[in-house]
Amino acid sequence: MTIYNINLGIGWASSGVEYAQAYRAGVFRKLNLSSKFIFTDMILADNIQHLTANIGFDDNQVIWLYNHFTDIKIAPTSVTVDDVLAYFGGEESHREKNGKVLRVFFFDQDKFVTCYLVDENKDLVQHAEYVFKGNLIRKDYFSYTRYCSEYFAPKDNVAVLYQRTFYNEDGTPVYDILMNQGKEEVYHFKDKIFYGKQAFVRAFMKSLNLNKSDLVILDRETGIGQVVFEEAQTAHLAVVVHAEHYSENATNEDYILWNNYYDYQFTNADKVDFFIVSTDRQNEVLQEQFAKYTQHQPKIVTIPVGSIDSLTDSSQGRKPFSLITASRLAKEKHIDWLVKAVIEAHKELPELTFDIYGSGGEDSLLREIIANHQAEDYIQLKGHAELSQIYSQYEVYLTASTSEGFGLTLMEAIGSGLPLIGFDVPYGNQTFIEDGQNGYLIPSSSDHVEDQIKQAYAAKICQLYQENRLEAMRAYSYQIAEGFLTKEILEKWKKTVEEVLHD
């Protein structure tokens, strides 16, 4: 039995989908369930192992579509500059280095090699470019050996990619990809040819030899959904819903507009064993919508995309009147609204302090607002920090995001006993905040009148302290958090997998 989790790409700045997958990979390791995480995008800018290891995958859990047909394993880069130069004859004249880029020149020949290093302080090469008479002719990509080459031809003074070759460990070519205007058109093996990426993905899916003891979990489907659906019918198929799944504004009594990332999956819900959402509230909404707008009544299970190992008490005591938020400092997080609300509430509660954790593009705007209101003494930007032991030093958590599919920081905050104040929006806030019990849900409207928002948040901050309900709310936060303990989520996954495989 193997659980195959299918995604497209991964990068250094991963999205919530990759973090959810990495968390799931850890769950499957703890449950001793055999699992593979499949990435189907062409990923060459970095060795994929560096990206997957960075977020928490084990190498043996990762399958990359393009080297699956070779015997090369997922492994960190260990090829050196000297190893690279062995692929390229000629007598070296000199080298030029700029950060992670090393250029090697040769005597009496109009050619040079540019090595792109893993780290400017290490001699390890991720990929190399070979230039001859001013033209880029080849790029090689390395992990513990060369795994791919790209070939270029000059056209209108531009290097045009016309072929990729993937190798076995011993350097023998396994297959070529013939390119046309940057698009993969033909996959040429010694004994077979595939036309187009869908045919290539289908061959990959067939090579897994799926059966009813296997589970395929589809995280993203763009460009591959139909093939995965068709080939996964010999196994069990689950689909993860990672975001808001429909457009509220374009939905009426007779018609629903699904999020286009889920349209194919929902339209073909009869081919799916079960859907996975991360909150009970989204589960309820989706069940109602399937019943109302479709002929399908699929199984939908709620499994959170994160958990907390234990509840965290305040060992050093909490700082009185202390507020905290933690997120990317991005426009959609609306930290500026929180800053203005705290400035307003501070007029009534002068002991208030507000610490903001995270970094991002709104940093300078927030500093400007704080400075303009002479609020530096009680509102501070703290940058990045390991927050697990920090939440419990504070009394209240604030969030102004108008869309939070789950909200890992909200979960972590209640796990440290913090009451929360946030908008009454799906799905994270409605999951972690029980209005009046462990915080407050503030009504949200689409026009977002800033002054009204500021006043509403300030009023709730003051109400929380003036009604002297901190202790009761703290206890209720801990109570909600118990449902998100790691042991609970492990049990949910265990039960879900057992049910589907013994169905």
Curated annotation (Swiss-Prot):
SUPFAM superfamilies: UDP-Glycosyltransferase/glycogen phosphorylase. Belongs to the glycosyltransferase group 1 family. Glycosyltransferase 4 subfamily. NCBIfam families: accessory Sec system glycosyltransferase GtfA (TIGR02918). Required for the polymorphic O-glycosylation of serine-rich repeat protein PsrP. Catalyzes the first step in glycosylation by transferring N-acetylglucosamine from UDP-GlcNAc to serine residues in PsrP. Part of the accessory SecA2/SecY2 system specifically required to export serine-rich repeat cell wall proteins encoded upstream in the same operon. The GtfA-GtfB complex adds GlcNAc from UDP-GlcNAc to PsrP (experimentally characterized with truncated PsrP-SSR1 constructs); this subunit alone has weak N-acetylglucosaminyl transferase activity that is 10-fold stimulated by GtfB. Residues 79-195 are annotated as: Extended beta-sheet domain. HAMAP family: GtfA. N-acetyl-D-glucosamine binds at H242, E332, E404, G405, F406, G407. The gene is gtfA. Changing E244A: Loss of N-acetylglucosaminyl transferase activity. GO terms for biological process: protein O-linked glycosylation via serine. Keywords: Cell membrane, Cytoplasm, Glycosyltransferase, Membrane, Nucleotide-binding, Transferase. GO terms for molecular function: glycosyltransferase activity; nucleotide binding. UDP binds at G16, V17, E18, Y19, R328, K333, G358, H384, A385, L408, T409, L410, M411, E412. Residues 196-306 are annotated as: C-terminus R-fold-1. This is UDP-N-acetylglucosamine--peptide N-acetylglucosaminyltransferase GtfA subunit. It catalyses: L-seryl-[protein] + UDP-N-acetyl-alpha-D-glucosamine = 3-O-[N-acetyl-alpha-D-glucosaminyl]-L-seryl-[protein] + UDP + H(+). Residues 307-503 are annotated as: R-fold-2. Pathway: Protein modification; protein glycosylation. GO terms for cellular component: cytoplasm; plasma membrane; protein N-acetylglucosaminyltransferase complex. It is found in: Cytoplasm; Cell membrane. Encoded in RD10, a pathogenicity island with an atypical GC content that is associated with invasive pneumococcal disease. Pathogenicity islands account for greater than half the genomic diversity observed between isolates. The main function of this island seems to be correct synthesis and export of pneumococcal serine-rich repeat protein PsrP. Residues 1-78 are annotated as: N-terminus R-fold-1.
